[in-house]
């Protein structure tokens, strides 16, 4: 590839205002923290708030290591034109990132067929498209916090929960035609024809409700509350819509179906030492995250599809899960941003895509052998490392060894998965890249960064049921992955790459793919990077705000 065509050059020139090839630079000439408009804003805000805090000291960037001795870099969000400050990519400062997680956590999918069978077989009540529509109207009153069965019940202010609703989807085209379009997630309209047929075949004639519990519920309570909130309102809505007696025995079957038997949560329950219930980030399988991201519906570019999943996963797993839930700190942001800013991973991945197209014929064109893994991963890894050698500004951009290791290995893994259509081959491309990188630089990142990479190849084909799980079924709680940044989002992207290569409509669960194709969601899951950029530019309007119940401000 011509050096001047590197995708990351524009970003590097804007970040540093120097020739990216220049080997020498200056320090202590940038004005310290004052070079950053956002830091100046932080200081001004903190000074005003000290009095409100009763004089308790507050934010002071002069405490600790001197900030701004080097260039405080802005970041170009990859595949966009947005140039943003690093602070605005911290999830606490980015409403879009928060809503990305809110929209996942507040989602629960519930099968309707068990409840319909109870109605018809136990109670002798006919279920028709008309009664389903009546039920859907009822649940859209009850789910946000409206009362339906009892008097003297307090209710939730609608302006607090405007984002809450329920919809329905089915693989049965005849039934879908009869459902009120306000309540339907229309597979035929939202997916390309070939993908729609794959999904409908997988779903069959079954019918599912998607509950979007209020964002505010997830914030005040937790992910484990979501299915319970949904189930309670489902039960009340069935009682109301089908005029049932609240105390009869069959109601217990509705409760069991809505809370347990027919419930699909976005994340599995975690062990006690993680102290989290269902629908929390640590339980989201990589295949599930790949299905949550919707780029494959709207883009024919398999690299773009993969990179959007990487960005989503890096933000959720590295920034929120490991950086927040698990470590309790404010760091880890730059582990994630390395994968979705400045077009660097994009450049490495498109290089790999061009390589496999010329050598093997493109996506899903070669069997997943170790020779193939070694060839592709080595080629892409050496390309990436050569860029760090050639452009010192690139080295400064990815100032940490584990940033460079993660980005280079992600490109190697994605490319290998694209060529083979196999996620296991892809993750082995990642592992090999890490080992090659360590040979090249004698180190990667912090102590223990590459623990999982040293043993990963052997584990990837293990007979032990947890170690040998397909990449789609692994997640942040998989053995060796549980507390290590700079890996998990990339694994999710490698998962997507394999399925993009094969033209699959979904990676793991077609129900989740359909649920997040819903255009009524607050966050646009077709383009996570663009949404993160909107959040950084303060253009994104989130849900879950409390303005209706607090003084004007």
Swiss-Prot record:
Named cofactor requirement(s): coenzyme F430
Listed pathway(s): One-carbon metabolism; methyl-coenzyme M reduction; methane from methyl-coenzyme M: step 1/1
GO molecular function, one term: coenzyme-B sulfoethylthiotransferase activity
Entry-linked InterPro entries: Me_CoM_Rdtase_asu (IPR016212), Me_CoM_Rdtase_asu/bsu_C (IPR008924), Me_CoM_Rdtase_asu_C (IPR009047), Me_CoM_Rdtase_asu_N (IPR003183), Me_CoM_Rdtase_asu_N_sub1 (IPR015811), Me_CoM_Rdtase_asu_N_sub2 (IPR015823), Me_CoM_Rdtase_Fd-like_fold (IPR009024)
Cellular compartments annotated: Cytoplasm
GO cellular component: cytoplasm
EC number: 2.8.4.1
Modifications after synthesis and translation: Is methylated on C5 of Arg-274 by the methyltransferase MJ0841. This post-translational methylation, despite being not essential in vivo, plays a role for the stability and structural integrity of MCR.
Chief place where the protein resides: cytoplasm
Superkingdom of the source species: Archaea
Cofactor binding comment, as recorded: Binds 2 coenzyme F430 non-covalently per MCR complex. Coenzyme F430 is a yellow nickel porphinoid. Methyl-coenzyme-M reductase is activated when the enzyme-bound coenzyme F430 is reduced to the Ni(I) oxidation state.
SUPFAM superfamilies the UniProt entry points to: Methyl-coenzyme M reductase alpha and beta chain C-terminal domain, Methyl-coenzyme M reductase subunits
Entry keyword set: Cytoplasm, Metal-binding, Methanogenesis, Methylation, Nickel, Transferase
Catalytic activity, reaction form: coenzyme B + methyl-coenzyme M = methane + coenzyme M-coenzyme B heterodisulfide
Residues with 5-methylarginine modification: 274
Annotated positions binding coenzyme B: 228, 259-260, 273
Annotated binding of coenzyme M, by residue: 335, 447
Role noted for this protein: Component of the methyl-coenzyme M reductase (MCR) I that catalyzes the reductive cleavage of methyl-coenzyme M (CoM-S-CH3 or 2-(methylthio)ethanesulfonate) using coenzyme B (CoB or 7-mercaptoheptanoylthreonine phosphate) as reductant which results in the production of methane and the mixed heterodisulfide of CoB and CoM (CoM-S-S-CoB). This is the final step in methanogenesis.
Descriptive protein name: Methyl-coenzyme M reductase I subunit alpha
Lineage of source species: Archaea, Methanobacteriati, Methanobacteriota, Methanomada group, Methanococci
Gene from which this protein is expressed: mcrA
């Amino acid at each position: 590839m011509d050096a001047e065509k590197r995708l990351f050059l524009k970003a590097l020139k804007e970040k540093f205002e120097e020739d990216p090839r220049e080997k020498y630079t200056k320090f202590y000439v940038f004005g310290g923290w004052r070079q950053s408009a956002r830091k100046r804003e932080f200081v001004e805000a903190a000074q005003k708030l000290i009095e409100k805090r009763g004089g308790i000291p507050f934010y002071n960037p002069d405490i600790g290591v001197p900030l701004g001795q080097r260039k405080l870099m802005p970041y170009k969000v990859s595949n966009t034109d947005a140039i943003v400050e690093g602070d605005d990519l911290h999830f606490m400062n980015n409403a879009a990132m928060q809503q990305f997680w809110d929209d996942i956590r507040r989602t629960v999918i519930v099968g309707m067929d068990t409840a319909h069978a109870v109605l018809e077989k136990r109670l002798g009540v006919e279920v028709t498209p008309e009664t389903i529509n009546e039920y859907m109207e009822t649940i859209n009153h009850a789910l946000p916090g409206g009362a339906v069965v009892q008097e003297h019940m307090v209710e939730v202010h609608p302006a607090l929960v405007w984002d809450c609703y329920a919809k329905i989807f089915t693989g049965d085209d005849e039934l879908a035609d009869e459902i009120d379009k306000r309540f339907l997630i229309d597979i035929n309209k939202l997916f390309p024809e070939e993908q729609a047929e794959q999904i409908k075949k997988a779903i069959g004639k079954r019918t599912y409700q998607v509950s979007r519990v209020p964002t505010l519920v997830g914030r005040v309570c937790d992910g484990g509350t979501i299915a319970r909130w949904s189930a309670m309102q489902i039960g009340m809505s069935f009682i109301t819509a089908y005029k049932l007696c609240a105390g009869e025995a069959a109601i217990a079957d509705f409760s069991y179906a809505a809370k347990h038997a027919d419930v699909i949560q976005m994340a599995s329950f975690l062990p006690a030492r993680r102290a989290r219930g269902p629908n929390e980030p640590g339980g989201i399988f990589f295949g599930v995250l790949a299905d949550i991201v919707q780029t494959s519906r709207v883009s024919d570019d398999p690299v773009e599809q993969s990179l959007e999943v990487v960005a989503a996963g890096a933000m959720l797993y590295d920034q929120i899960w490991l950086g927040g839930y698990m470590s309790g700190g404010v760091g880890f942001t730059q582990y994630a941003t390395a994968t979705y800013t400045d077009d660097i991973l994009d450049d490495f991945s498109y290089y790999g895509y061009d390589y496999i197209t010329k050598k093997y014929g493109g996506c899903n064109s070669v069997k997943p052998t170790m020779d193939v893994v070694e060839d592709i991963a080595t080629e892409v890894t050496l390309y990436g490392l050569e860029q760090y050698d050639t452009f010192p500004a690139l080295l400064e951009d990815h100032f940490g060894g584990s940033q460079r290791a993660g980005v280079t290995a992600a490109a190697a893994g994605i490319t290998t998965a694209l060529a083979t259509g196999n996620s296991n081959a892809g993750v082995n491309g990642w592992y090999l890249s890490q080992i090659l990188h360590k040979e090249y630089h004698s180190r990667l990142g912090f102590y223990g960064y590459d623990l999982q990479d040293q043993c990963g190849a052997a584990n990837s084909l293990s007979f032990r049921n947890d170690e040998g799980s397909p990449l789609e079924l692994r997640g942040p709680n998989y053995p060796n992955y549980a507390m290590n940044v700079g890996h998990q989002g990339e694994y999710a992207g490698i998962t997507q790459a394999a399925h993009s290569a094969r033209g699959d409509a979904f990676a793991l669960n077609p129900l989740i793919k359909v649920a997040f194709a819903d255009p009524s969601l607050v966050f646009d899951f077709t383009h996570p990077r663009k949404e993160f950029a909107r959040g950084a530019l303060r253009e994104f309007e989130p849900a879950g705000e409390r303005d209706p119940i607090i003084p004007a401000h």
